[in-house]
Amino acid sequence: MMVIRPVERSDVSELMQLASKTGGGLTSLPANEATLSVRIERAIKTWQGELPKSEQGYVFVLEDSETGTVAGICAIEVAVGLNDPWYNYRVGTLVHASKELNVYNALPTLFLSNDHTGSSELCTLFLDPEWRKEGNGYLLSKSRFMFMAAFRDKFNDKVVAEMRGVIDEHGYSPFWQSLGKRFFSMDFSRADFLCGTGQKAFIAELMPKHPIYTHFLSQEAQDVIGQVHPQTAPARAVLEKEGFRYRNYIDIFDGGPTLECDIDRVRAIRKSRLVEVAEGQPAQGDFPACLVANENYHHFRVVLVRTDPATERLILTAAQLDALKCHAGDRVRLVRLCAEEKTA
């Protein structure tokens, strides 16, 4: 059975294996054991209440409960940009016009922005390609909404998610090649590694401070502004079905889109509800896949089950209860997947 749980120190070796499969561009999951260990430790201290809000971040893993294999990772940053500036570009417009010459040009322009400072961030979503089946991607991505719904006071009113931009299998980023490399004088992979290992001072020191006309970029770079890596397209679709939208903010490195949504308007958060759980044999029928989560902050668990999403009393097997760290009579959080999201 596939289960979402909080990250543990012993997960570092399996997370290293996951990091080696990302293909680059996933800044928050570098193939660097020391950095991953620090990230795990920060998550543990967040759960223990030892960190200020500006440093808090939760990390979860998707585990096969039968084998202990870690198949995926996802995370939430509580409030971005309160320690180090959180940069992106806002894609806006500058108008150059002359009535005398009868000239009017509206030019797409990139403006350096810190507009999302303080927002909660969905990040570090990666599922091992071998496990991209049977609804695992939905479970991994949406489990975070179940945690946010249960512990709403831990998070801010706006949630953002940076989507990985267009990068090829060799680490070539058209957006970086045309813009970032001119200011940072390094390859994309180097900048990505430095950022992923926490060495972010160079961003503020070297990045352009003035608006940039996108027409000055290569056509290839212009074409990928706000576009996602092919492997990230499903993750974008999942978030958009939950209510997230692209509001013309992009990543400063690869030009990938930043999606955003008010936390209380996220579908899974808004529609999830608490029901009593009982042990037994679930009724047979053509029921939709639903997320089920416990309400245990320190031992949070989420699984995917097929059940009636309108039920007031959820029947689970002993194995499902054990996976959720629940007992009969406990209350669990329940919400169905979107109707078009299939798990088989």
UniProtKB/Swiss-Prot annotation:
Q: Which InterPro entries does this UniProt record tie to the protein?
A: Acyl_CoA_acyltransferase, Arg_succinylTrfase_AstA/AruG, Arginine_N-succinylTrfase
- UniProt xrefs under Pfam families: AstA (PF04958)
Its recorded reaction(s) are: succinyl-CoA + L-arginine = N(2)-succinyl-L-arginine + CoA + H(+)
Q: Which EC number(s) does the record attach to this protein?
A: 2.3.1.109
Q: Report TM segments.
A: none
Q: What's an example Gene Ontology biological process for this entry?
A: arginine catabolic process to succinate
Keywords, sorted A to Z: Acyltransferase, Arginine metabolism, Transferase
Output the superkingdom of the source species: Bacteria
Protein residues bound to succinyl-CoA: 125
Active-site residues? 229 (proton donor)
| Gene3D superfamilies from the UniProt entry | 2.40.40.20
Keyword Transmembrane listed: no
A single GO molecular function term of this UniProt record: arginine N-succinyltransferase activity
Q: In which pathway does it act?
A: Amino-acid degradation; L-arginine degradation via AST pathway; L-glutamate and succinate from L-arginine: step 1/5
Q: Which family does it belong to?
A: Belongs to the arginine N-succinyltransferase family.
The record, for NCBIfam families, names: arg_catab_AOST (TIGR03243), arg_catab_AstA (TIGR03244), PRK10456.1 (NF007770)
HAMAP family, A to Z: AstA
- State what this protein does: Catalyzes the transfer of succinyl-CoA to arginine to produce N(2)-succinylarginine.
Name of the featured protein: Arginine N-succinyltransferase
From which organism does this entry originate? Escherichia coli O6:K15:H31 (strain 536 / UPEC)
